[in-house]
Structures are given as structure tokens and as C-alpha cells.
A protein has these predicted regions:
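Outer-membrane beta-barrel translocator domains and adjoining extracellular loop/strand segments
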Residues: 1-5, 42-48, 108, 117-123, ...
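Transmembrane beta-barrel strands of outer-membrane/channel proteins
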Residues: 1, 29-35, 44-46, 97, ...
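Residues on the lipid-exposed face of transmembrane beta-strands in outer-membrane beta-barrel proteins
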Residues: 9-15, 93-99, 108, 175-181, ...
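Gram-negative outer-membrane beta-barrel transporters
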Residues: 130-273
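Extracytoplasmic loops and strand-loop junctions of Gram-negative outer membrane beta-barrel proteins
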Residues: 1, 60, 72-79, 156-164, ...
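C-terminal beta-signal and adjacent terminal beta-strands/loops
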Residues: 260-308, 315-322, 326-375
Length: 375
């Protein structure tokens, strides 16, 4: 049994205090790094056996007593003991400061999981007999025909089953910040701002098997393409939140107003491989793929996938802002608190163009109440 450790460490260095504007400025830098391991479930490691069948003969005359169907039943053991735990490494560095009741912090982080779980396909060659029922003399039958002496040909079929692999990668990185002021006496209000820029990438670290959905001479396509680059996406966004917290103690009122801004959000699909690096035949043999040869081959050219450049362009959604309001009232010596909130009471969501299409956006506000008791 192999042990898996999840070490983590954090360190903060407080720098010497300095005077700024006649007041103390306390500041420091910090960092941390750690690993997190996620173990596969039992059904990933030991899934149930997979059974399949292939029709070898289907003799189906009008006379019911003469009918016979012969199947080859095969069993696949999908035991997956080679699957490893998914490992995630995260580190961060940052700085913080406090001055005159105001605080500020900024943090950069990166999180990389290179062995995440995903489903993949494995192809197996199954050899079955294809009996020639045209050789059966129905007039000589007293019952279902015998397979002995019946001519047949061996036919190889590629069959697939899914299993879990360590073929997924997730990379997250971003910048977070927060800032808050002391309560401004003139209006008894504290200002708090925070936000983050986040970029997430999803990638497949293992080759993809692809079989064109076409028929060749009335039979399923005989080859499986093996592609290196496939199904990846990345997303990024920048969001901020500005909150004004105003208290009126004499009336027992608290006003909270937040301005939530999404400055942009975007996504892009990673380009897929147009040409496979190799391909698999029905016998399970891997052959190198020559694009020049495949262009003129009526069968191999189906492995060349269509590539549309517009599908992989970066798509960005522009600025949008929502304003939320919450009013709280304390009653009966602070034993009862009643709050009314209205989210998206005001919004800024301008229309924008995406290519030749105009995208119109709308926001639906909603409201509610909260009632808290203290006994």
C-alpha cells in the first residue's frame, strides 16, 4: 500500500512598522503552498463486468420451428487498478497592510491539477463468425439448421468501452484583493471593496479516440483516429464589489448598498486536432497517419476532421453592473431584527455585438424580507 501525504505550509513575515502621516503602518508579506489528493471511488477502480454480443447468424424464415439465431457473447473485465489518485498543487503569495483603521490585502494564487479524472474509451478487437445462411436448404430442414458444415467467414469488429483515466487537467490562477476603510464619522459609513481576476483552463492530457459516423460498403467505419489535441476550454473574468455600510444607531437602522460589477467575462474553446497522429485498424494495429496520402484516399480522408476557425475565437461579454440594497431595523432592544432587501434594484447591462448579431441583455430584480429573533 502506497501512502499519500498532503503537506501544507503557510508563512507570514511581518515587516517593521513605519510611520505614515503620523500614524503607524503595519504591513507584511505571506505565502503558502500545499497539495491535496483526491482518491478514486470503488466504481472507478472495480466497475462491473461489461458484456456484449455479436450476431453470427440470423436465420429467420416464415416457419417458426426452423428459425435460429446464434450470438457470440463476450465479456470485458474493466478492472482499473492503474488509476491513480488525482493530485492538486496550490500556492499563493500576497501582501497586507493596516493603517489608521484601513486595511488592504492582495493575493496571487495558482492551482494546478494535472491528473484529474475523466472518461476515456478503449477499443478491443472481437473476432466473430459470419455464417452464410444462403447455403441452407430449407426444404431439407426438420428443425433449426445446424451450424456444422455451414460456410462462414471470420469478421473482426472493433468494440469500445469507457473507463476512468487520469487524463484531465485543470489550471486555475488569479488575483484577489480587498480594501476597507474605517467608518467615516460624518456619515457613519464604512466603505469596503473587493474583487478578483480569475482564469480557468480545462484540458485533456491524453489522446482522443475518434471514429467517424459513416458507413463503408454497408459496414461501420473500419478505423479509429488517435488525436493529440482535443476538447480544451478556458474562461476568464474580472469582478469587483463595492459596499457602503451606513449605520444610524439612534433609529436602529443599517443601510447596505452594494455595487457588483463584472467588467468582462470571456471564454474560448481550444482548437482540436484536424489530423490524427495515427489510427487504429480492426486488428488493433496502430498505423502512422500521412495527411498527404489520406487526402486522396476515399476511406482515410474521413479521419480528417472539419475545422471551423470561428468556433475557436475568443468570445467576450462586456461590462455589467447590478446594484443591491438592504435595509435592517432593530426592534425591542435589539431582540428582533427585520430586514428588507432588493437585489438588482438598478442595473447597467448595455447591449453588445457578437459578430454580426446584436445581443440584448435584461435583468430581473427580486426582493425579500428577513426576520430574526433573539431569545
Amino acid at each position: 500500500m502506497k501512502p499519500y501525504l498532503d503537506p501544507r505550509t503557510n508563512l507570514r513575515i511581518a515587516l517593521p512598522t513605519i510611520l505614515l502621516g503620523g500614524r503607524k503602518l503595519d504591513y507584511g508579506v505571506y505565502g503558502g503552498i500545499g497539495r491535496h489528493t483526491k482518491f478514486p471511488t470503488m466504481d472507478m477502480l472495480f466497475p462491473d463486468p461489461i458484456y456484449g454480443d455479436i450476431t453470427q447468424m440470423n436465420y429467420w424464415p416464415v416457419e417458426e420451428k426452423l428459425r435460429r439465431v446464434n450470438l457470440l457473447v463476450y465479456r470485458i473485465d474493466p478492472t482499473n487498478t492503474s488509476l491513480q489518485p488525482a493530485s492538486n498543487l496550490k500556492w499563493e503569495v500576497g501582501a497586507d497592510a493596516d493603517w489608521n483603521g484601513c486595511s488592504f490585502s492582495i493575493d496571487w494564487f495558482r492551482e494546478d491539477m494535472t491528473s484529474g479524472f475523466r472518461y476515456a474509451y478503449e477499443y478491443l478487437s472481437v473476432i466473430a463468425k459470419k455464417y452464410d445462411t444462403s447455403a441452407i436448404d430449407k426444404s431439407a430442414l426438420a428443425g433449426p439448421p445446424s451450424l456444422e458444415g455451414l460456410p462462414y467467414q471470420n469478421d473482426t469488429t472493433l468494440t469500445a468501452y469507457s473507463f476512468t483515466t487520469n487524463g484531465s487537467r485543470t489550471l486555475k490562477q488569479g488575483l484577489e484583493f480587498s480594501f476597507s476603510t474605517r467608518r467615516i464619522k460624518a456619515i457613519n459609513t464604512r466603505i469596503t471593496a473587493n474583487g478578483a481576476w480569475l482564469r480557468t483552463e480545462y484540458m485533456n492530457s491524453q489522446p482522443e479516440y475518434y471514429r467517424p459516423n459513416v458507413m463503408i460498403s454497408g459496414k461501420p467505419y473500419p478505423y479509429i483516429g488517435i488525436y493529440e489535441m482535443n476538447d480544451g476550454n478556458f474562461y476568464d473574468s474580472l469582478v469587483t464589489n463595492l459596499m457602503l455600510d451606513t449605520q444610524i444607531p439612534s433609529l436602529g437602522l443599517i443601510f447596505s448598498t452594494s455595487f457588483q460589477c463584472k467588467w468582462f467575462s470571456g471564454r474560448r474553446s481550444m482548437p482540436e486536432s484536424k489530423y490524427p497522429d495515427s489510427y487504429l485498424d480492426k486488428a488493433g494495429t496502430v498505423h502512422p497517419f500521412d495527411a498527404a496520402v489520406a487526402e486522396g484516399d476515399a476511406v482515410l480522408r474521413h479521419l480528417i476532421r472539419d475545422y471551423t476557425e470561428s468556433l475557436y475565437q475568443y468570445q467576450r461579454t462586456p461590462f455589467a453592473m447590478n446594484v443591491n440594497l438592504k435595509v435592517s431595523k432593530r426592534l425591542y432592544r435589539d431582540k428582533v431584527s427585520c430586514s428588507l432587501y432588493v437585489n438588482k434594484i438598478f442595473d447597467v447591462t448595455p447591449d453588445y455585438w457578437r459578430g454580426d448579431a446584436l445581443v440584448r441583455r435584461s435583468v430581473t430584480p427580486y426582493f425579500g424580507m428577513e426576520l430574526d429573533f433573539k431569545i
